[in-house]
């Protein structure tokens, strides 16, 4: 026992050490926040709405992109190089919409399982992929609610769980989402396939 005489405080090193060890192990400092189902569920529902809005905007943009590509291919001579560049952008948006759809379904699932999430200490095995994918995607997609969702899962399951999700340790991320949100450009074959399909549909 150490007595800090200036303020009359008795410090018990063992108790403090145990408290800090628990906080370090989970990556949670209770003084600054903690898991709250009342915060997580509304954020999941808001994310679902945000994904739906983003999907609709992307879909409308893609329709315009398709018309622009068709016009470039119909010119005499066809402006194939410009059309090819536009097609890459179209493919990226197409991939993004597909990833959004999967992430939206994941948020809906987690919202329905909020009671289970709240009452367990470890992440349920059948939710590891959905939760890890949401955490991983929070740093990539422009859906602000995912930041708070990621924070709540860090409070609930610990910083190690969050870090493993961010690094995709053990391949926990949904493979389709990982592919669709990859920074790698689409293959030349895929771009050509899109161009041919657009040309056929706008003859």
Predicted regions and their residues:
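Extreme N-terminal basic, low-complexity initiation segments
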Residues: 2-6
């Amino acid at each position: 026992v150490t007595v800090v005489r200036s303020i009359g405080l008795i410090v018990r090193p063992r108790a403090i050490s145990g408290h800090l060890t628990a906080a370090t192990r989970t990556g949670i400092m209770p003084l600054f926040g903690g898991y709250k189902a009342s915060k997580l569920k509304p954020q999941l529902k808001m994310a679902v709405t945000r994904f739906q809005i983003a999907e609709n905007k992307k879909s409308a943009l893609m329709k315009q992109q398709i018309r622009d590509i068709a016009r470039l291919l119909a010119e005499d001579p066809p402006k194939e190089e410009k059309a090819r560049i536009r097609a890459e952008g179209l493919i990226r948006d197409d991939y993004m919409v597909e990833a959004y759809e999967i992430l939206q379904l994941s948020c809906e699932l987690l919202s329905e399982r909020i009671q289970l999430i709240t009452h367990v200490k470890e992440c349920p095995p059948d939710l590891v992929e959905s939760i890890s994918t949401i955490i991983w995607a929070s740093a990539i997609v422009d859906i602000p609610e995912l930041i708070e969702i990621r924070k709540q899962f860090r409070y609930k399951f610990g910083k190690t769980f969050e870090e493993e999700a961010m690094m995709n340790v053990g391949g926990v991320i949904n493979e389709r989402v990982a592919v669709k949100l990859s920074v790698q450009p689409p293959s030349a074959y895929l771009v050509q396939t899109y161009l041919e399909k657009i040309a056929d549909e706008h003859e």
